[in-house]
Amino acid sequence: PYFDYEGKPYDNIVVLSREDAEHAYVFGNRLYITEHPLYEQDGVLYLIAGEEEERVRIYEEAGEPADMYVLPPEIMTRVSVATRETSQTQPPAYAIQSILEQEKAHNVCKVYELQLTYDKVRDEYADDTSEDYLQDVYLTMNYGGNRAQLYQDGKLLTDWFSNGEDWTVALKRYGYPKYLTLVVYPYEEEVYYDLQPRKGCELHEASAHAVYKLEV
């Protein structure tokens, strides 16, 4: 790029690509580029990341950028999700339904039981001083249908209207539940979405992964 200055030029100009600019953070006199969330708490920088080594590029006020590598946690949480489709084809008695939906005689659904197993795994460098930096666990569901509801012990936790993307739910706020019920409602009406909607009425896949709060 070409720069036309008025007055005294700056000592250092950093030109970022669009992708880097979308992943840029400024703390103090430093510019940080990272693909993962970065925030400051009590004067300490933390990166929210997974189980891989992550690179953070740092720009000072002058000089060339330097790369910092944040190591993965020594104690990790591996989460597996087992799914079972029930024989129900009508919304459970506790499912929240609008009056309009209740009037639809053809309004069938599919109900799935989800069982989540949380296992702690220690890497070869872990010892008695190693800490558990678990920040959250995200449950991701790929389903075809108009919308879905997630329940725990008959209580609605959250719901989602299909927009062509996977549905991801943070589980920390719900106490990392082990058993959940998913209700999927059929895709019936042609509605405009940015992404191609996933038609049908079924759960295709459910998975979960953990993220960690790592000091930079």
Predicted regions and their residues:
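Non-catalytic C-terminal accessory domains or segments of carbohydrate-active enzymes
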Residues: 1-216
